[in-house]
Amino acid sequence: MAHFSSEDQAMLQAMLRRLFQSVKEKITGAPSLECAEEILLHLEETDENFHNYEFVKYLRQHIGNTLGSMIEEEMEKCTSDRNQGEECGYDTVVQQVTKRTQESKEYKEMMHYLKNIMIAVVESMINKFEEDETRNQERQKKIQKEKSHSYRTDNCSDSDSSLNQSYKFCQGKLQLILDQLDPGQPKEVRYEALQTLCSAPPSDVLNCENWTTLCEKLTVSLSDPDPVFSDRILKFCAQTFLLSPLHMTKEIYTSLAKYLESYFLSRENHIPTLSAGVDITNPNMTRLLKKVRLLNEYQKEAPSFWIRHPEKYMEEIVESTLSLLTVKHNQSHVVSQKILDPIYFFALVDTKAVWFKKWMHAHYSRTTVLRLLETKYKSLVTTAIQQCVQYFEMCKTRKADETLGHSKHCRNKQKTFYYLGQELQYIYFIHSLCLLGRLLIYKQGRKLFPIKLKNKKGLVSLIDLLVLFTQLIYYSPSCPKMTSAAHSENYSPASMVTEVLWILSDQKECAVECLYNNIVIETLLQPIHNLMKGNEASPNCSETALIHIAGILARIASVEEGLILLLYGANMNSSEESPTGAHIIAQFSKKLLDEDISIFSGSEMLPVVKGAFISVCRHIYSTCEGLQVLITYNLHESIAKAWKKTSLLSERIPTPVEGSDSVSSVSQESQNIMAWEDNLLDDLLHFAATPKGLLLLQRTGAINECVTFIFNRYAKKLQVSRHKKFGYGVLVTRVASTAAGGIALKKSGFINELITELWSNLEYGRDDVRVTHPRTTPVDPIDRSCQKSFLALVNLLSYPAIYELVRNQDLPNKTEYSLREVPTCVIDIIDRLIILNSEAKIRSLFNYEQSHIFGLRDFIIDGLSVERNHVLVRINLVGGPLERILPPRLLEKSDNPYPWPMFSSYPLPNCYLSDITRNAGIKQDNDLDKLLLCLKISDKQTEWIENCQRQFCKMMKAKPDIISGEALIELLEKFVLHLTESPSECYFPSVEYTATDANVKNESLSSVQQLGIKMTVRYGKFLSLLKDGAENDLTWVLKHCERFLKQQQTSIKSSLLCLQGNYAGHDWFVSSLFMIMLGDKEKTFQFLHQFSRLLTSAFLWLPRLHISSYLPNDTVESGIHPVYFCSTHYIEMLLKAELPLVFSAFHMSGFAPSQICLQWITQCFWNYLDWIEICHYIATCVFLGPDYQVYICIAVFKHLQQDILQHTQTQDLQVFLKEEALHGFRVSDYFEYMEILEQNYRTVLLRDMRNIRLQST
């Protein structure tokens, strides 16, 4: 290492010279040599660019190469010492490694080498300085003897070292260079002067008084016929751009721009015409392009630093550029004789107008650019639009088989040295397209429109320009089928326009103003119209163009405003019958899937075209409102049919034989088929994004394959595209809302994987948890590192799914659990974590030390035991937020952190029992009398119903508490009786029931029903609504109800457990009616018998339609109740429209509103609302219609909005909604809000609710 080469010395010398040039201002301003040395020693602390200097980088690399491995070894030693018990902090480790390194032999050798080479480099620099100084003095004496004294004057201090003096550039030297650059000087003198100028520090050159004169002379010299001299001046300009401050580079830039402007305006320079084209091997063209490229390179770099300088510098650069780009010659009337303007050459070196993109990125420069475009240089925008118009007209008039100007971009991969006129026109078109696309992103840019074009009547509006862009996609020629290299497609017209429109669609405000317009949508859909009529889409339209159109439509459909436009058009209330964009896209997609369009039959690109348009449909049908529009097209059936066909093809692909020529072709074919199969599964899967769509998915019979597809992506940790509405986690949650979905998740291995992951996090902790800080004492019932896995499992545990997963299974209850035994199913998790009914289970969960302290205390108060006590009390008590007292879930900060008694055995401590008192009876009220009077008058059925409903609403708003007790019983009985007497109000036919008590005496209820009876009676007695003997009476009612409903059920063979026998849960609606009727079993059953004829019974009384003969067979076989695919479907649709923040919160949490609403409705809001509110919920739906079930749920979400947003942030929304009561919610408080919802949505909701018996689409 002691020896070093001359190349190393030269390299270090150049690095060191550049370092001193960069810090010269700092060290020359020092009062003494010692201060200068001090500045250099502390340069790292004072210079923010210290680590960017080449010399510093060289030293860092040299140290790393020499000492890097040794430092790593020392670090490993220290780490191993720490693991063995020697605790030491990070700073201590650094000190130890530093000390050992400095004491090493390698470090000493490295320092010796650096010292020797730096001494040699400095001495060489000093010697070179002395030689250069002597040579300069001699030259000065020969040329200007009269000024020799001033040239030799040295203004530096005697105390300065020769190293500092070597970078002193005096005024006299610059004046000498100015004189030597004069065109009359000999070539050698001019070359030498320019060489001296290039090697001088830029800051010294700038500080000289003659800098402006020098800049002007350099600009003039750019026209020098000598190419070598011209190139050296360009080299100086490039060096100035690279190393100088902005105010210096600004002078060079504006000078170069003005030079180019004068160059193009001068008649003496030979600028080619459009017909002649550009030969870049021509020396004149080469030099011109070099100058343009240099200017363009600085254009792209300037925005990164000009914000740190005064605005006037940036304005001068922008204005000089725009002035140059708007230069126009006196053009000939013949286009081919047109002299090329500067913009053509800028388009050659920067085809995609990257410079304009960078200038428009920051508000600082964008404001100036747009102001100047509006006031002085609008012609730049005008000519860009004109170029796009000309290219479009050329595409329309040119024959399809003619080779167009962009052919070389698409087909010829070799270097192009000559550009034809058509190619120049195309390159300028691409530049104009990118410039306009960037301009339209910004509001002030769009304000430049409309624009007047030459030789064109009228003004070009913003929409006109977007229509032009859109038409270019299918009128312009395209490259060969997308099988060529990726870069070949980058500059095709359709790809470029599509890229611009994609960018516009990503900016919401811009998209609304530019793309979300009926005219633009109709233009996009025009080729589809033509194809569906049997015509060609356009003279040049291809599969590639259709794929681009579909890509743009998909972007539009992925945004709410664009989706509404596609669904309903610009005027949602319009009476026009013309189909909207969504209908046209769906019709075309269905024809493609059914192969009902012959024009592309046999095309290799046909599957890609199909996939692109189905993707648009997927964005639409993955929303509730979109599915309502597209449901009539039965796209799920067409996609399923195509998937089954593709699946059969994939099975028939022969296994490639090694060595066979067909291996690659077979492999490619199989990959294409498998990719198409996955796409179709993904399309089917997205029907699960809505409750009704999930029903359609289950009807296709492909739900198992779709769930397996999700699991494969989950296992591979694949990301979802940002333009997809749903992540797969949300879809999994929705699938788990049904019994068939739960089974599919189990078969795929999804549930097994989630349970294993949860157990791993609970038992072993996460691998990526930082260990540098000790874990705090646990105060939460669940560790944050486990919460994500826990919530993922909670999302899947809906009642229908969990019933399928655990029914008919016993707890293992093993005598011993080994450490390696990992739960793999839901019943295992219940056995190991929830029902800890044996010592073996308890000890398997705790460490040896923890399990030995159990006998020392009755209870250990911590976050987990507090949570357990809360859960046990909650399970034992039934009631709403005011009807039960639940212990807190957090410890208090006091001497007695948890004053609540632990509930470990019966009876429940009295402190948890509420002292709520109920009125024995409510005095008669005038409004109630009016309502009861209405029930007796029924001359005109419609008016009578409306009067009753109006009076009921009035009472609910003013005196809601009156509607309870005996009054509520009388209201319900009389209103339902009157409704059933009118055939028009009866949805279901009358069913005669003749079973006696003896017939049902020997029938048994399920254990779930029996448990529900006990809870109901306990709750009824607590509210003083039920008396002794109520348990037998409720049992009687439930048995007769099951017998009554069994008469209306159909026989079905299904593997789903929930469809094998009676309703799979407790009948909470019957229990509620039994309590409303104050335990009168006869009244209860009579009311239910009458009520079962009304449409409302289908949605309030869930067992009413269990395997019902009134539902289509495919609906019954799915096991999905109308409450899910109808009520909760509309709840989600209204939630998105009325409470978008809440809807987004659910989406972010990966939890579905439909799942929690199904839980609320299934148990009639028990444990969520107080009894009086449950009565009002039932009465409201009976009096006002089943659609009020939807409105009440929306009102609940409105009431909970702030809580939902808060718990979304804390990532426990699922737990909050499932466990917390609806504190403060009263049905009567939201009646006016629900009436508004009724006005807006009742027609649609009731129509769909009445169609459940015909729901076969």
Curated annotation (Swiss-Prot):
Q: Where in the cell is the protein located?
A: Cytoplasm; Cell projection, Cilium
Bias (Basic and acidic residues) ranges: 134-152
Q: Which InterPro entries match?
A: BROMI_C, BROMI_M, BROMI_N, PHAF1/BROMI, Rab-GAP_TBC_sf
Q: What Gene Ontology cellular-component terms does the record carry?
A: cilium; cytoplasm
Every copy of the Rab-GAP TBC domain together lies at 1119-1242
Does the keyword Cytoplasm feature in the UniProt annotation?
A: yes
Residues covered by region (Disordered): 131-160
Kindly list the biological process annotations in GO that this record carries: determination of left/right symmetry; embryonic digit morphogenesis; heart development; kidney development; lens development in camera-type eye; non-motile cilium assembly; protein localization to cilium; retinal pigment epithelium development
Role according to the record: Required for high-level Shh responses in the developing neural tube. Together with CDK20, controls the structure of the primary cilium by coordinating assembly of the ciliary membrane and axoneme, allowing GLI2 to be properly activated in response to Shh signaling.
Q: What is this protein called?
A: Protein broad-minded
Q: Which organism is it from?
A: Homo sapiens
* Organism phylogeny: Eukaryota, Metazoa, Chordata, Craniata, Vertebrata
